[in-house]
UniProtKB/Swiss-Prot annotation:
Keywords: Antibiotic resistance, Carboxypeptidase, Cell membrane, Cell shape, Cell wall biogenesis/degradation, Hydrolase, Membrane, Peptidoglycan synthesis, Protease, Transmembrane, Transmembrane helix. GO terms for molecular function: penicillin binding; peptidoglycan L,D-transpeptidase activity; serine-type D-Ala-D-Ala carboxypeptidase activity. Belongs to the transpeptidase family. It is a single-pass membrane protein. InterPro entries: Bact_Transpept/Beta-Lactamase (IPR050515), Beta-lactam/transpept-like (IPR012338), PBP_dimer (IPR005311), PBP_dimer_sf (IPR036138), PCN-bd_Tpept (IPR001460). Residues 197-223 are annotated as: Disordered. The keyword Cell membrane applies. Pathway: Cell wall biogenesis; peptidoglycan biosynthesis. GO terms for biological process: cell wall organization; peptidoglycan biosynthetic process; proteolysis; regulation of cell shape; response to antibiotic. The lineage of its organism: Bacteria, Bacillati, Bacillota, Bacilli, Bacillales. Pfam families: PBP_dimer, Transpeptidase. It is found in: Cell membrane. This is Penicillin-binding protein H. Involved in the polymerization of peptidoglycan. Plays a redundant role with PBP-2A (pbpA) in determining the rod shape of the cell during vegetative growth and spore outgrowth.
Amino acid sequence: MTEIGREPKKKSKGNRAIRMNLFFLAVFVLFTALIFKLGVVQIVEGEQHEEDAEKSNAKTAYYPAPRGKMYDRNQKVAVDNQSVPEIVYVSTSSTKTEDKIKTAKRLASFIHIDTEFLKERDLRDYWIAAHPKKAAALLKESESNLKGDQAYKLQIERVPDQELKAIQQDDEEMETAAIYTRFSSGNAYEPQIVKAMNPNKSNSNGKNGALLDEKKNSSQRPKNDLTYDEISIVSEHLEELPGIDIVNDWTRKYPYDKTLYSVFGGVTTPDQGLLSDRKDFYLTRGYANNDRVGKSYLEYQYEEYLNSHKEKVEYVEDNKGNVVSQKTIDKGSRGYDLQLSFDMELQAKVEKIIEEEVRNSRARGNYMLDRAFAVMMDPNNGDILSMAGKKIDLKTNKIEDYAIGAFTTQYEMGSAVKGATVLAGYQDGIPHYKYYIDAPMLLGTNLIKKSYTNMGTINELTALQKSSNVYMFNVAMHIAGVTYKPHGSLPADQNDLLKMRNYYSQFGLGVKTGIDLPQESAGMQTTPKTVGGLILDLAIGQYDTYTPLQMAQYISVIANGGYRVQPRIVTSIHKPGKKDQLGKAIEHRKPKVLNKINNSESDLKQVQTGMKLVTSSGTAKNTFTEDVSGKTGTAETFYYGTNRNWWGKKTYNLTFVGYYPSKKPKVAFSVVVPSVDDDDKINKIIAKRAIHAYAELEKKHSKK
């Protein structure tokens, strides 16, 4: 029995040994796998994990790259960039206030800096930063537990006035305060411009956009503009100036000087930074507070394309926030380039013509004349070939670019609108060759409406040729459903006025043209309590006001056979190309027809015939050497310009609209000259010279 009872114990010991062996085997396998994994991590993946660890402590700074360029239709650079040296400051996560103060003081010993921008609040901030113990003493013991912002607010309020005066009386400390303020304008790893070179002060001729000289130039103002001497000395002491660097930034350069300057628009400075009304819009798209953005016209309109892809520099910090390495991870690139519809050579010639003729007209006694405009566009695709405007300062006699006035200011255009009136009459049922008697019209007891002379029996052709007002009055009355009776009333109402305006709007008169620029005016339309005879004034361009650009669009409709084409300035957008060459196009802006007028081909041919009569034997005969068709305009008005002493004085706006050549026109144009005598010919002279300049350039380009 005893022998039989011992057998189970032997089996139990054997099972235990097997389990122990299996356990040790499992432990061995696990340790082997762990060792293998550690080997993989350390040897195979070591570099990757090290990079990942560095990335967790990496910070990125963005440095500016140039904006996109603008080219004219002939691929000539119209708006360029040039490199500008500047001193920048970049703080890190571990940068303390005392570090900024120390660096600011050291930098102030090497450079001069303008202090005019400093405000009292800046000086208070600087004093607290420069005197931390004194600033702490400004708080009462009971205020020691206040939160940082609350405590700082009290300190700012309590900075002693004598301390501020002491700073203001010390030029060196004022410059230190200015530098410290620049340092503190942004966040860590956000480069702050301390001082930049002014390219416009670096050459003797003073032309805007000339390249920086490669040698020192004494004409630079030392406080406002960085000098080569300052660059040299700062470069020698960079090790003593943590966070300071000298980099190349950019500024706009204009190869054609002030030509079209206002239309190109402006760009903010780093001090101005983002536009306040669009700040959130820009910040959500990765902009920094001190980034420069387009602030007007083309620069503003095409900001999303012109804005550059910034250079990225990566800074790696240790656990204490100290920078242990830095490297450029993206060199950045300039923004997209724009190809414009402008012919810069033509533009320059037309601007010169306007400037010369404005001065000539003023010399003839037109002392109230202070501006003139000429717009030239391709009537077939809407390309603006030239948009020139000049405005003279009546006090200094200096003439400035005012091209933006061609689409932002409006004027009574006079008889130049009569082509639209005739076509409106056709739409309203007036037949071709409808005859009226051109004689004074007597309305009511004492209102006389007439042409400048009695023309007898006329139709639409002679009405355009001789510029009959009476024919147009009859068109307006037909539209209003009124039959003329001597000394009778003219019961036209708001509906009649609206009906005429709707006819005109088909041509672009009284509505925006759709040009790709901000702030376009639609002209001015009022709503009178009583319409009556005002509808007659509307028919001859003496009531509603229009822009010079609207007039160019209107005459383009007649020139191209009845299509209102949207004016365009940017024709295509391109990737940056080689030096002064367009790169690959990323977008082509196709011509856009906004509407077709409700007139037949024969209607348009009839008006085209009338406009040819104007230049061959009418009010513009012997004006052009080229085959031009068009219409003159004279609007009686009153002066309400910049000189209030002349307000209310009677004057005239002289205008001209036309196209060239008369058959298959390539260019349509408008000329608008406000505030001149009615017998002056400045409108015709500008039109003649502008078309001649176009024709000469056309010959020149055809030979290439």
